Amino acid sequence: MALRCWDAARSLGSRIFGRYACSVRALSSLPDEKKKFLHNGPDLQDFVSGDLADKSTWDDYKGNLKRQKGERLRLPPWLKTKIPMGKNYNKLKNTLRNLNLHTVCEEARCPNIGECWGGGEYATATATIMLMGDTCTRGCRFCSVKTARNPPPLDPSEPDNTARAIAEWGLDYVVLTSVDRDDVVDGGAEHIAKTVSCLKERNPKILVECLTPDFRGDLRAVEKVALSGLDVYAHNVETVPELQRKVRDPRANFDQSLRVLKHAKEVQPDVVSKTSIMLGLGETDEQVYATMKALRAADVDCLTLGQYMQPTKRHLKVEEYVTPEKFKYWEEVGNELGFHYTASGPLVRSSYKAGEFFLKNLVAKRKTKVSKV
């Protein structure tokens, strides 16, 4: 299985070094030919920075893609990613630590952390800041974020610290998400709204996406965030209605999430709305299609679909690894249903490449439309 975070890379390095240190004495007793082979052989960099398997090898993959009873599926080649490296990755990581900020990229062990944090020639380096601490009051069975009934109190300096960090990075698109805080009166809506305000004060041109909780269905809290000055209102339904009780915390459900998305658009019609669905949890094609239709009927603008990845053995097992071709099919379905933007792929996540040109242009067009009215 490919390693998906820097901590895992460090762990691998220490294990390799430990084994090497234990075998130094044995090395001296090897024949010269074997010594030469080991000396000229690959090192750690050859494993972590080499090219990933190309598409031509995907067709030859013979492993099971659907889980049988008592089985744990092996990771197919199209889900293997590179270990995050580079100057921009390290810069973002260091800034976060210095300001005591958290990202969902790290806490949820996202496989795209190197790609999003690293940016690229045509991409915006994007880190999804996780507000209100790193401990959630809910226990969804797919999520690796820490949980507790009474997490530490909110940090009143977090909104300003977040704005300072984003200003230091020089980003033009930022994603704010949060843990669920059912222990806070408004679910943290005021805290999120204040963070958006601080960001806009420091940089009025910055585009802000908020991936929010459901606030226990409190539409006043939804309204508070929707009217905060954000550009994209995101809230994830996570899976099809039929699997909600199996996958999400009992306090969450599909209808409640749909009301959140609809209300955000009702109070702020020009905001871009967005949601995400994980595949590979046991859903059927008919259920996925019906869910997509329901989301579009609720006037959701953007949809992302990605492969569910089991973060630890304590979490839900992967029922199926969906092929890249099937994800492409769902992207085409999304376009046919009228979503303004559909991102569908094995490694796509709700905040994946949030600063892509299309989404940025969509926000810009809506702002231009409003200014002309």
Curated annotation (Swiss-Prot):
Keywords linked to the UniProt accession = 4Fe-4S, Iron, Iron-sulfur, Metal-binding, Mitochondrion, S-adenosyl-L-methionine, Transferase, Transit peptide
**Membrane spanning residue stretches:** none
Instruction: List residues binding [4Fe-4S] cluster 1.
Output: C105, C110, C116, S351
What the entry lists under SUPFAM superfamilies is as follows: Radical SAM enzymes
Which pathway is recorded for this entry? Protein modification; protein lipoylation via endogenous pathway; protein N(6)-(lipoyl)lysine from octanoyl-[acyl-carrier-protein]: step 2/2
PROSITE patterns, A to Z: RADICAL_SAM
Give the cofactor note text: Binds 2 [4Fe-4S] clusters per subunit. One cluster is coordinated with 3 cysteines and an exchangeable S-adenosyl-L-methionine.
Query: Cytoplasm: present as a keyword of the record?
Result: no
> Which residues of the sequence carry a binding annotation for [4Fe-4S] cluster 2?
C136, C140, C143
The residue ranges of the Radical SAM core domain are: 121-340
Task: Kindly indicate whether the keyword Transferase belongs to this entry.
Answer: yes
Q: Name one GO biological process term.
A: response to lipopolysaccharide
- Which Enzyme Commission number(s) are listed? 2.8.1.8
- What does UniProt give as GO cellular component? mitochondrion
**Molecular function (Gene Ontology), one example:** lipoate synthase activity
Query: Of which family is this protein a member?
Result: Belongs to the radical SAM superfamily. Lipoyl synthase family.
Which PANTHER family does the entry mention? LIPOYL SYNTHASE (PTHR10949), LIPOYL SYNTHASE, MITOCHONDRIAL (PTHR10949:SF0)
**Under which name does UniProt file this protein?**
Lipoyl synthase, mitochondrial
Species the sequence originates in? Rattus norvegicus
